Regions:
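Conserved acetyl-CoA-binding loop-helix of GNAT-fold acetyltransferases
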Residues: 89-103, 125-130
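Conserved beta-strand-loop-alpha-helix junction that forms the acyl-donor binding cleft
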Residues: 115-125
Length: 149
C-alpha cells in the first residue's frame, strides 16, 4: 500500500519502514512504534495509524502523518501530522495530508475528519485552512477542526 503525489510517497509505517527511517536518523516516536505493535494484533489497523512521508527525489523521510485509529461509529477519524523542522513551510504537510484525506474519503468508511492544533501553531493552522477544514471551536490551548466529505 502506497499513496503518491507529485513530490511524495506516503507509506504506512511498518517494522521494515521504521528501520529505513531510523537509519536516516528519523525519530519514529512512540505513536509509530505503538501503531506497528497494534497492527501485529489486527492487520486491519494498518492504514488507520501512522504513515511516513517520503520525498520522491531522494527517498528521505520528511515526517509522518496519519490517523488516530479506525473510523468510529459516526464514521469519523482524527488526522495528525509532524514534520522535521527543516521541511516546514514547503507545502509538504498540505500535499501529504490532502492525499491521505482523499484516500480516507474514498474508502467509504469515513464521512468526517477531525483535527486539533495548538492556538499558537500558525504553520499547522495554515495547513488545516488550506485543506478547507472548518474551525469547530477552541479550548484554552487548542483549536478543533473538522472536514466533512
Amino acid at each position: 500500500m502506497k499513496l503518491e503525489t507529485e513530490r511524495l510517497y506516503i507509506v504506512p509505517c511498518t517494522e521494515e519502514s521504521i528501520h529505513v527511517a531510523n537509519e536516516q536518523g528519523y525519530n519514529s516516536g512512540p505513536h509509530i512504534v505503538g501503531h506497528v505493535e497494534n497492527v501485529k494484533q489486527d492487520k486491519d489497523l494498518l492504514p488507520w495509524g501512522a504513515w511516513y512521508v517520503i520525498r520522491k527525489e531522494d527517498d528521505i523521510v520528511l515526517g509522518d502523518i496519519g490517523f488516530k485509529g479506525k473510523p468510529n461509529e459516526e464514521h469519523t477519524v482524527e488526522v495528525g501530522y509532524g514534520f522535521i523542522e527543516k521541511y516546514w513551510n514547503k507545502g509538504y504537510a498540505t500535499e501529504a495530508v490532502s492525499e491521505l484525506i482523499n484516500w480516507a474519503f474514498q474508502t467509504g468508511e469515513v464521512e468526517m475528519i477531525i483535527a486539533e492544533t495548538l492556538l499558537e501553531n500558525e504553520s499547522s493552522i495554515r495547513v488545516l485552512e488550506k485543506l478547507h477544514m472548518k474551525r469547530m471551536g477552541t479550548t484554552e490551548t487548542m483549536i478543533n477542526w473538522k472536514l466533512e466529505k
